[in-house]
Swiss-Prot record:
Its EC number is 3.1.21.2. It comes from the Bacteria. This is Probable endonuclease 4. Zn(2+) 3 binds at H194, D241, H243. SMART domains: AP2Ec (SM00518). Zn(2+) 1 binds at H78, H118, E157. Binds 3 Zn(2+) ions. It catalyses: Endonucleolytic cleavage to 5'-phosphooligonucleotide end-products. Endonuclease IV plays a role in DNA repair. It cleaves phosphodiester bonds at apurinic or apyrimidinic (AP) sites, generating a 3'-hydroxyl group and a 5'-terminal sugar phosphate. The lineage of its organism: Bacteria, Bacillati, Actinomycetota, Actinomycetes, Kitasatosporales. GO terms for biological process: base-excision repair. It is an enzyme of class 3 (hydrolase). Keywords: DNA damage, DNA repair, Endonuclease, Hydrolase, Metal-binding, Nuclease, Zinc.
C-alpha cells in the first residue's frame, strides 16, 4: 500500500487492486493491499452474490478510513452483482434499491470515494427506454440522498454486452446519464475488459484513445473516476466477461500504456480484477506501474 503523505505526491494514476476483506476491512484488506504494493483499493461491503446488508465493524471501519487517509490511498466499494434497476421483477428492483443504498452508506462510513454498480439489463423482453425510465424512478432518489460532502460518487460500470444490457458501448452511457439528469454525484467506472468485449477494439496505435474520446464526448469531462484494468481472455466484440492478467490477453500491454497518457485519465486510479492469487495480483500491479512510469 502506498505510504504517500499527501495527494500532491500521488502518481498520475494510482494502481491497486480489489482486495479480500473477510476477517476485517483493515486487518485483512489493507494487509493484502500492502503485499500488492497497492496505491488504491476496492472492496466489497456485502456478499457480492447476495442481498444481505450487513452492518460494518466500527473499529475496522475507522482503522480502514484512517489508514487510507494517512497513506493517500483512494478507496472504492463495488456493489453486489445482483443489483439490476432494469429488472421486470418488482422484488429484484426493491432489493436493488436497498442493496445500493447500503453500499453507498457503507462507502461513506469507510471513506470510499466511489461506489461501483453495474448498469444492468432490460429483462422480460422490454424495450430499453422502458427500463431506463424505471432506472430513473428508483436510482435518482438514491443519488439525491448523497448530500454530505464525504458521500461517495455513484460510478456506473458498463457490461460486456451480454443479453439485453442497458449499457455496454461508450455511447450507451448517454441515455443512462440523461435518465439520471447527469446528476453531479454520477460518474463512470470504465472496465477495459468489458468495453473491449462489447466491441471497442482497444488495440492498435489509437484504439484506446479513440474509445476514451468517445466516452468524454458522451458523458463530458470529469466523469471518468475509476478504471477497472483487466485484460480479456476473448477477442474484441465477443460479449464475454472473462478477465485475464495484464498483457496475457487479447488487449495486450500497449493499450494500458496508452490509457495512462490520455487527458481523461489524469488522476484516475486503476484497480485490477484479474485472475489468480496474491502473487498474480502483485505482478499485475507491478506491470501496470511499469507501463505508467516508463
Amino acid at each position: 500500500m502506498s505510504t504517500a503523505s499527501s495527494s500532491s505526491s500521488l502518481p498520475r494514476n494510482p494502481v491497486g487492486g480489489h482486495v479480500p476483506v473477510a476477517g476485517g476491512l483493515h486487518s485483512v484488506g489493507l494487509s493484502y493491499a500492502r503485499e500488492l504494493k497497492a496505491e488504491a483499493v476496492q472492496v466489497f461491503v456485502a456478499n457480492p452474490r447476495g442481498w444481505a446488508t450487513p452492518a460494518g465493524n466500527p473499529k475496522q471501519d475507522e482503522a480502514f478510513r484512517e489508514a487510507c487517509a494517512a497513506g493517500s490511498v483512494p478507496a472504492y466499494v463495488h456493489a453486489p452483482y445482483l443489483i439490476n434497476f432494469g429488472s421486470h421483477t418488482g422484488a429484484t428492483v426493491e432489493r436493488s434499491v436497498e442493496s445500493l443504498r447500503h453500499s453507498l452508506r457503507r462507502g461513506r462510513a469507510i471513506g470510499a470515494l466511489g461506489v461501483v454498480v453495474h448498469t444492468g439489463s432490460a429483462t422480460g423482453g422490454r424495450e430499453r427506454p422502458v427500463a431506463l425510465k424505471q432506472v430513473r424512478e428508483h436510482m435518482l432518489p438514491l443519488l439525491d440522498e448523497l448530500t454530505h460532502d464525504d458521500d461517495p460518487y455513484l460510478l456506473l460500470e458498463s457490461t460486456a454486452g451480454q443479453g439485453a444490457s442497458l449499457c455496454s458501448r461508450t455511447w450507451d452511457f448517454g441515455p443512462y446519464f440523461e435518465a439520471l439528469d447527469a446528476h453531479p454525484k454520477l460518474g463512470v467506472c470504465l472496465d477495459t475488459c468489458h468495453i473491449f468485449a462489447a466491441g471497442h477494439d482497444l488495440t492498435g496505435p489509437s484504439g484506446m484513445h479513440q474509445t476514451l474520446d468517445l466516452l468524454v464526448d458522451t458523458v463530458g469531462e470529469g466523469r471518468l473516476r475509476l478504471i477497472h484494468a483487466n485484460d480479456s481472455k476473448d477477442v474484441a466484440g465477443a460479449h464475454k466477461d472473462r478477465h485475464e492478467n495484464i498483457g496475457a490477453g487479447h488487449i495486450g500491454e500497449d493499450p494500458f500504456r496508452a490509457l495512462m497518457t490520455h487527458p481523461a485519465t489524469d488522476g484516475v486510479p486503476l484497480v485490477i480484477e484479474t485472475p489468480g492469487g496474491k502473487e498474480g495480483h502483485a505482478a499485475d500491479v507491478a506491470r501496470l506501474k511499469k507501463l505508467r512510469d516508463g
